[in-house]
Amino acid sequence: MRRCVIIGGAEIRTYDRVRQYFRPDDFFIYCDCGLRHQKALGAEPDLIVGDFDSHEKPETDRETIVLPVKKDDTDTVFAAKEAMRRGFDEFLLVGVSGGRLDHTLVNVYLLVMLREQGKQALLVDDYSEMELVGAEKVEIPERFPFYSLVNITGTARGITETGCKFPLDNGEIHCGYQYGTSNEVLPGQTAVVSVKEGLLLLIKDFPEV
């Protein structure tokens, strides 16, 4: 099955880096003012969605879903639901973090919504990759200078971190007390993270540009 790439309207400065994540057979959904990134990203839309309150409705033969301005879901959340309805199981989210904090938080929690539906999702912005970690082991290569684990769903237990500057064995992180910030992969190693109970947001920072 093809992967779905959802492109929002938040700022993107590192277009070259973002393009490196694209695959030839990706299905691209542009959300409203995410269309401003189309030329720089060099990816034609397979689907356009939005209420077009922040971008002019395009004159195009590409499939377009016009949404009402008054609605419960943001354009990005609608795009994710529509992609799931069409059978997509893997997602890449770009242009969805930064700028307005409310939209950024909603889009980070979109990772939770997708995971609850059994989908894989990765969020990429100018500074980092973000994904959720649960019982599966996730590897963090040395090319990421820092990484952080943030609890966004309550309490995470049985947290294990190896191959890093600050290892952890059977730890807990609560929403009210976050201590998993700015860990480092040891030179020549790959860090490995897993969680027995709950979910953690894994943020892998890119080297400074």
Label each PLM-derived region with a short phrase.
Residues 64-86:
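Short phosphate-binding loop-to-helix
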Residues 1-58:
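N-terminal beta-strand-loop-alpha-helix module at the start
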Residues 128, 133-209:
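Long, charged alpha-helical interface segments
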Residues 113-130:
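Short, acidic/small-residue loops that bind anionic groups at enzyme active sites
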Residues 63-69, 119-122, 147-148:
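A glycine-rich helix N-cap at a beta->alpha junction
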Residues 65, 91-96:
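Short glycine-rich or small-residue beta-strand-to-loop segments that form or flank ligand, phosphate
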Residues 101-112:
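Short Gly/Thr/Asp-enriched flexible loops that form oxyanion-binding sites at enzyme active sites
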